[in-house]
């Protein structure tokens, strides 16, 4: 053994080392896979058991149903038991047919719930001020009308009186105040609330809260009122809970003859309220009109686009006047509604007209602008052969000779490329400044409010660059910009053929309407023959203006133009005055003159090359801006142009009233 030596080919013996990390990981992974397979197998077995149990339950259920069908006795027992149960309070029969009504009034929130269903909830900031009114069907309890009247603002109480008077007797009325509803609640409105049985409504004070439920012409079901303790605070919130008994269906329905017109009327009157005699059971007002045809009607096949939103009572009034106008073609009318509102479409269906709804795009001014674009595009797509389109809005009254006015003047748009549009509206045509329904003007502004648009202008110029949805622009102000108008003018009448009656809208309220729209003159004379229509073409109009200026009597420029004595007490004369206007955009004196004449003064409208035309004391009155107007050459050398300096601005002057 002493001479033994280890073989150099054999690896020396050493102690066993620890397993490597790789082998450890591989071992654990193998165990995890085994565990996963075990879990999967268990899940499959569980699913199989579940399926077997479900199949057994289905078979047992079918067998039970089969046995029940063979023995009718259990069904009879069930029916007897069901008959002993109390029916649902809203739809059941018998003396328990009542509605549970909750009405809440407070400074910042109102809500109304009927049988646990909220039918009104308004807690938006700076919106919904005034008296909210809901009308329920007395037989079914469903909501027939929802309105809000901002009786803090002028004339909204008149709108509320009109609405409540047009609600049929027997309907359930619910009233509630948000924020403030008394400031312009006049005696007529208070007397009406008193006639409805309200005790607190006629005594409603500054910032009081009030809730009321009653039947028109019937009993009051509940009323709550909280007075404001001080001018700077509001009344406490009030919550009125009351039961309203339902009437029979017989009491809520009218029995008209079964005609196509009355079927339309019945569908309408069963759903909505506030439309007066159209739903009268005894003597309903007509919903079909037969105005005299218009001889040689040049606009018979011109499409009419009515731009509408969610103001159905406005739309109803507008469509009645439109369908009563001589020369109207109902099949050419399309009402475009911005949003999927039911009631405006109900109004459209009542009159048997075409209505199109679309999804609103954008917000505020941009939403209105996109609505106009979509409506104009759709109009020309619906009538691909039409060269023109008449554009109206839902808050306009239409004169009886509206289509006659357009028929006599529309050829000017075809023959004179210097024209932008024909409008039925005169921005400066007030009761004291408009006189001659046969007289037309050319003006540099686009008045809108009932106008004719040329297809080529829209498709080639306006549509491709119409303001996009992110631009919060007014569509009409955009159309008046020099880039769009490009020196072209519009034809307007001295006496407007449309009347803007709407006092609720994006850019409208009672104060604004009172100041700038209420006293506009509106033609009511049928069959007016327009005078010297072809003299409105570009070159001919210049000849006419120079003739008028040459014949006009120059007024005494030493007198105050704002005084009534500035014009003599005559009738049928033509007078001219010259005012300072240093350059084309210098309207300092004109703006002050417009203010004292109580006409449109918010921007410059109704002018033609520095010339304004209107009537005062039934005399034709012309005003020329010197030296900017080319008609300045008519100024006698001895006459000094009138200059009216604007008053200094008062610091901290209050603006228009907002939410209280």
Swiss-Prot record:
Residue numbers on the Cytoplasmic membrane side: 1-37
Keyword line: Congenital muscular dystrophy, Disease variant, Disulfide bond, Dystroglycanopathy, Glycosyltransferase, Golgi apparatus, Lectin, Limb-girdle muscular dystrophy, Lissencephaly, Manganese, Membrane, Metal-binding, Phosphoprotein, Retinitis pigmentosa, Signal-anchor, Transferase, Transmembrane, Transmembrane helix
Pfam families linked to this entry: GNT-I (PF03071), ILEI (PF15711)
Extent of Acidic residues compositional bias: 68-80
Domain GG-type lectin: 97-258
Tissue specificity statement from the Swiss-Prot or TrEMBL entry: Constitutively expressed. An additional weaker band is also detected in spinal cord, lymph node, and trachea. Expressed especially in astrocytes. Also expressed in immature and mature neurons.
Cofactor: Mn(2+)
Result after altering residue 156 to K: In RP76; reduced acetylglucosaminyltransferase activity
Residues that bear Phosphoserine: 7
Binding annotation for a carbohydrate: 129, 179, 207
Residues binding Mn(2+): 395, 500
Outcome (variant: residue 120 to R): In RP76; no effect on protein abundance; reduced acetylglucosaminyltransferase activity
Keyword Transcription included in the entry's annotation: no
Subcellular location per the Swiss-Prot or TrEMBL entry: Golgi apparatus membrane
CDD domains per the UniProt record, alphabetical: GT13_GLCNAC-TI, PANDER_GnT-1_2_like
Cystine bridges: 254-281, 269-279, 421-490, 562-596
PANTHER family for this protein: PROTEIN O-LINKED-MANNOSE BETA-1,2-N-ACETYLGLUCOSAMINYLTRANSFERASE 1
Protein name: Protein O-linked-mannose beta-1,2-N-acetylglucosaminyltransferase 1
Species this chain originates from: Homo sapiens
